[in-house]
Amino acid sequence: SFTDFVSSGVTWLDPFKVVGDQFVSTLTSAGFIILILGGYTGYMSHIGANEVTVSVLAKPIAHIKSPYILVPITFLLGNLLSLVIPSASNLAIILMATLYPVLRQAGMSLLSAAAVIATTATIMPTPLGSDNVAIAAELAKTDMFSGLTASDYVFRYHVLVSIPTLLVMALAHYFWQKFMDKRAGSDLTDGDVDLAEVKAVEGSALYRTVYAILPLLPIIMLLIVFAITSTTGAKIDLSVELASILSFVIAIICELIRTRKGKETLAGTESFFKGMGGAMPIVALLVAASVFVVGLKSIGLITELQNAMTGLSGSG
């Protein structure tokens, strides 16, 4: 924080030292977790596990013919897929390529299909989300939430708000899209869209099952440990980064068994570190935000705002 800042001894160097200090602070806490998650996501894409998960989850939608029933289902499915594909832009591209033609073929209007896809990846309660990791790390610095982990934050606090909110949003989507289509006079029978099938995943049922689970394995581990510790009182310290690294090792073993090519499989683990590099812009955003806050504190603006808010609540 700004109160802990130690000057370099040269005034014009201090702003750069603040940036450097924030990088060190972020990369050794929330930033490291985000990089690990980015690496795991990158490896899941490399071995095709994300593709299997999308295929398994998206295929059943093609059998539902009612366009408005598909609206809340697609919204909730998109949020579920955000566990596997944390990038909102990448998720939107995948949904547009796979689900959008299915929705149009089922008779959903163009704007309704676009709207439901655009609003996915909103507030999914997952300890794998970079936003939740960052918030948990900041809360853990306070006395009230000292030692708070991302899992505790999500499963004890976030989920109480986000799950009901997601259900309300799904229901609101159903009525709102129906109302807007009726008002706009959309032609719901217009299905002149080539149905782009979700890419078929070849392999045995065991392969599809295991590889569909792999992208979700870290959160499954965290949920199981949280349930055990909550019900039995057992002390098991499974952090997000530990769950991700353990899942990474399990994924490598699965790849070794599937391909029977040790050299190629181990060479493919490079995608994990490339994924970490791909997550670096998220860490840079956290650093930029931290530097901005330090700047506000240095000019006393944060203190003045706190005093003003205290005065308002006192007079109220």
Go through each PLM region and give its residues:
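Hydrophobic alpha-helical transmembrane segments and immediately flanking/interface helices
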Residues: I94-L111, A227-E241, L305-G316
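Alpha-helical transmembrane segments and, especially, the helix-loop junctions at the ends
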Residues: G38, G78-L95, Y100, Q105-D152, ...
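Juxtamembrane/transmembrane-helix interface segments of polytopic membrane transporters
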Residues: V133-A137, Q177, F226, A289, ...
